[in-house]
């Protein structure tokens, strides 16, 4: 059960929880009233086909998994936010990143700084608003080749809107930028039976259709039109979002008026293959948004009926990509590789098995593995680190011949106090392994350092 529900996190038809949080039909009644039963049943139907995203704790309770984002059904929206904070402690106010904090963030990802002192307990400052929604948006903005990257939406706007409305606002903001630069037109071949001669006369069709009507001409002409594939996709996205939004309906209706001359896309896949010329490359980000909404192109495609609409992202992947982005930005001269492969744990009859792919690899120096989890501080002997994670680190050290391993956890409200309780660990390499290229057993122990990475709240 969720227990106490924070009313600040409930907005209109949106119910907010954090990763791995459980909730029942009774928890929904505070906002959905008589619709709570129907909304819960719709979420149950979604969970039956998509247990990776939403599961059953028991017969009467659903539970979120490690995916964040939104699930919208006919009756409402379930908003799943990162587990960095407790919703009861969430402060509904602007928490815009200052220039100083951005500099502090970057500084904490410089490699020679990472290996030194732990991040200060008051890194974020006193009375800081740990806003999970702002965190999610800021992490999405660091994703490669994603439309989130260029969004200019403010933290204040984010804090005042449900997550789905934030995504819609980002799309509309991008559309506004495209409109100011000019909607793209192109020459389209049109065949039409006209009352006047225009373009090339199509003799075979002309004879078939105009044997009686001598005053008509069946012709083919090239028309410079707005009704092209990219604009059809944009109009189709606007039409979809008109049925999803409560905050932006008027703005979407006004935007649709700009596309009066444009039809709706009848084949998304085909229209997305349209080649954008370099003169109109400013369309690319907007079309990426169209893909997200029209084809659900997030990290997590889901199954089910059209009644459900979901935009979901795995937090482990978001955290890994965010840390990689910050490390590369803070250490431009280092060759930082993501998901580096080429090493296998075993070889069976000449076939390699069990590929080892650390999250981040700095060649011949360090392996960094991100863990989007809250270490258990009660496990004193294990320092809150899962045994399976240590086994994994040992395998990395052996195969990549690395002495320095770093486990990276998130620094947030729930991990601030853990920094001083989790100690640095060492594998006694003399007892356990020797690197093949060495003439003698390894003299240096393998250091495993636990690091708490600051997040972009």
Each predicted region: which residue ranges?
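Catalytic core segments in nucleotide and nucleic-acid processing enzymes
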Residues: 1-50, 303-457
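Residue(s) in the substrate-gating loop at a strand-loop-helix junction
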Residues: 3-303, 307-309
């Amino acid at each position: 059960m969720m227990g106490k529900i924070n009313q600040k996190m409930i907005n209109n038809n949106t119910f907010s929880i954090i990763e791995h949080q459980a909730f029942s039909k009774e928890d929904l009644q505070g906002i959905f009233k008589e619709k709570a039963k129907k909304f819960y049943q719709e979420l149950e139907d979604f969970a039956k086909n998509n247990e990776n995203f939403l599961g059953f704790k028991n017969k009467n309770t659903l539970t979120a998994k490690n995916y964040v984002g939104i699930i919208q059904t006919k009756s409402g929206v379930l908003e799943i936010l990162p587990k960095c904070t407790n919703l009861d402690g969430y402060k509904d106010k602007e928490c815009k990143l200052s220039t100083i904090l951005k500099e502090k963030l970057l500084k904490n990802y410089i490699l020679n700084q990472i290996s030194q002192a732990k991040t200060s307990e008051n890194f974020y400052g006193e009375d800081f608003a740990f806003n999970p929604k702002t965190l999610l948006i800021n992490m999405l903005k660091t994703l490669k080749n994603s439309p989130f990257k260029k969004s200019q939406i403010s933290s204040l706007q984010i804090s005042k809107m449900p997550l789905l409305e934030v995504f819609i606002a980002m799309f509309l903001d991008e559309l506004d930028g495209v409109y100011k630069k000019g909607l793209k037109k192109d020459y389209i071949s049109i065949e039409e039976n006209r009352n006047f001669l225009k373009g090339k006369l199509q003799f075979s069709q002309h004879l078939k259709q105009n044997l009686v009507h001598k005053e008509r001409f069946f012709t083919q002409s090239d028309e410079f039109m707005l009704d092209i594939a990219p604009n059809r996709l944009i109009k189709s996205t606007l039409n979809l979002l008109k049925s999803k939004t409560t905050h932006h309906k008027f703005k979407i209706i006004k935007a649709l008026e700009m596309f009066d001359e444009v039809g709706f896309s009848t084949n998304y896949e085909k229209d997305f293959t349209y080649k954008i010329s370099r003169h109109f490359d400013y369309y690319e980000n907007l079309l990426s948004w169209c893909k997200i909404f029209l084809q659900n192109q997030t990290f997590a495609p889901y199954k089910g009926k059209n009644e459900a609409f979901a935009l979901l992202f795995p937090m482990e992947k978001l955290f890994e990509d965010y840390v990689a982005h910050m490390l590369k930005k803070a250490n431009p001269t280092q060759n930082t590789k993501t998901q580096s492969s080429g090493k296998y744990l075993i070889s069976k009859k000449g076939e390699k098995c069990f590929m080892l792919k650390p999250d981040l690899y700095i060649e011949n120096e360090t392996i960094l593995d991100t863990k989007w989890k809250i270490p258990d501080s009660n496990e004193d002997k294990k320092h809150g680190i899962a045994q399976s994670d240590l086994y994994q680190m040992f395998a990395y050290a052996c195969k990549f011949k690395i002495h320095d391993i770093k486990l990276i956890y998130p620094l947030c409200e729930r991990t601030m106090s853990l920094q001083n309780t989790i100690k640095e660990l060492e594998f006694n390499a003399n007892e356990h392994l020797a690197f093949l290229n060495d003439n003698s057993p390894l003299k240096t122990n393998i250091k495993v350092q636990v690091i708490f990475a600051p997040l972009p709240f």
